[in-house]
Amino acid sequence: MEVSGPEDDPFLSQLHQVQCPVCQQMMPAAHINSHLDRCLLLHPAGHAEPAAGPHRAGERAKGPSPPGAKRRRLSESSALKQPATPTAAESSEGEGEEGDDGGETESRESYDAPPTPSGARLIPDFPVARSSSPARKGLGKRPAAAAAAGSASPRSWDETEAQEEEEAGVDGDGDADVDGEDDPGHWDADAADASFGVSAGRAHPRALPAEEIRQMLEGKPLADKMRPDTLQDYIGQSRAVGQETLLRSLLETNEIPSLILWGPPGCGKTTLAHIIANNSKKHSIRFVTLSATNAKTNDVRDVIKQAQNEKSFFKRKTILFIDEIHRFNKSQQDTFLPHVECGTITLIGATTENPSFQVNTALLSRCRVIVLEKLPVEAMVTILMRAINSLGIHVLDSSRPTDPLSHSSNCSSEPSVFIEDKAVDTLAYLSDGDARTGLNGLQLAVLARLSSRKMFCKKSGQTYSPSRVLITENDVKEGLQRSHILYDRAGEEHYNCISALHKAMRGSDQNASLYWLARMLEGGEDPLYVARRLVRFASEDIGLADPSALAQAVAAYQGCHFIGMPECEVLLAQCVVYFARAPKSIEVYSAYNNVKACLRSHQGPLPPVPLHLRNAPTRLMKDLGYGKGYKYNPMYSEPVDQDYLPEELRGVDFFKQRRC
């Protein structure tokens, strides 16, 4: 590496004096070290009166800084040999001087030297290394007028970040470098908005390059990255946590009771707990999160023990959040009971299952159940648009016909990403109120389109490719594969749908019956379960009005067992339509229920079986009177007058009366 002296460096020859950071006096650079030793003895740090000195126009006046804040500056010979190429710090400085705020952009240097007479020379107290790295050459282009008017300024160690931004194609203010006079793939964002049909009804930020969007989407799921931290950013659930609701008032005053958050997936249960956690940290409240899918009883006991210590020694509250609390069995849930009762912990549980069935009744009585509903389409659109804007993606108005492939750019340049407004609406509808599904579907669609363009450039070997990546409605549908159907074979929706199917057939609505059948099968329901329910329906609701209905149901069950899904769909559909059209009769069903009611309401021992109805297989039984007086009906041509009920129930008709 060649070391240059000040006489060989044209950049250092332009500077002569530097400013003392303590007393603000100007002096030759060679004397600054000895001057600082004397100045610090005469003027303690922070008490020196600054001397008046010139500052560059538009630059903020900077106060004195301690000597330790002085930073050495390196001069790179590769940059000095190209006076037309500005540094990243100079580019950002120039933009700050021309901005509306009158030079609010600060320089990246620790402090800037004042202007010196032309031809003056600065003698540094350390050698300046000349860099010969090829990566530092040709980092940017500068207009000739700007190169002639501006003079080079010292480079500090802080300019490394600016240099990296310049290499990545980012200018001083952090935005993408759109100086496309020498870039064949350059495009103007404003011109693209006008010609490419950017939706005017929705706010959109400045478009970011595709590679930057890709980096933003990598790592955690988009749904986790977009999780809000405050109630003000919480979208939806106005009935539960809207303005002037009791729960919102309690959360804002940090008086949090024990809660059970019940709602479908993606409705905001975990997000609401995340907001409570952030608010708790501000008030020095412990917030512990456990998942019932992997936590054990010992983990819960450890948290409770630590909560007891925190409460005893530091008077500090503990909030315990249990995600998927329904995965705990009843004995595990009993662990919380005494500690919730005495206030050792504040329990917040989240569940997608009906807490009436899945949560211990004693624990449920000590918690307030908050029902979170499925997010409406309007809320889903708002959530998706917030994510789209944060990613720097433009929304296009699909009513204006455009051809996104009509513009091409160099494969080495980064395109911008656009999405159709109807694609956003479709994603909001297909998500079915699940914000997690919608955001992750958006992430998948964007990454898939960016990857397809990258593979196109790599495999085709072509120089140019579309300069705009457009996400269409088909891309969104392909990412979700199908309509997002909320259905859980082991959850409440399982019972809701089979109940709806049963009632639709009972009401002779063949259209609704087919709908609920298809919804269950498309949601992944076991066809044999549906067939078993149809066998039950044949006797319960049709009964003797059409005795062949039971044969239809049994045949449908056997057919489903033989051929399976998806071929058995039509078998079940035929059976469902047959039952919806068949006459209904609950005579047998009601009579049997009357018999059960009679047995359950009987007081005392049940009456014995009459002797003439008992079987007498042995001689002893015959001697005891078993079967004595029984009349064998086939031996009589006329009806036989004989009682078949116990003596206490003579005259009871279960087909006409409910109780015996």
Swiss-Prot record:
Residues 50-191 are annotated as: Disordered. Its EC number is 3.6.1.-. ATP binds at P265, G266, C267, G268, K269, T270, T271. This is ATPase WRNIP1. The lineage of its organism: Eukaryota, Metazoa, Chordata, Craniata, Vertebrata. One of its GO terms (biological process) is innate immune response. There is a cross-link at K81, K141, K220, K296, K305, K311, K317, K330, K477, K622, K628, K631 (Glycyl lysine isopeptide (Lys-Gly) (interchain with G-Cter in ubiquitin)). The modification Phosphoserine is found at S65, S75, S91, S92, S153. The modification Phosphothreonine is found at T85, T116. The UBZ4-type zinc finger binds ubiquitin. Residues 76-89 have a biased composition (Polar residues). The modification N6-acetyllysine is found at K628. It comes from Rattus norvegicus (Rat). Keywords: Acetylation, ATP-binding, Cytoplasm, DNA damage, DNA repair, DNA replication, Hydrolase, Immunity, Innate immunity, Isopeptide bond, Metal-binding, Nucleotide-binding, Nucleus, Phosphoprotein, Ubl conjugation, Zinc, Zinc-finger. GO terms for cellular component: chromosome, telomeric region; nucleus; perinuclear region of cytoplasm. Pfam families: AAA, AAA_assoc_2, MgsA_C, zf-WRNIP1_ubi.
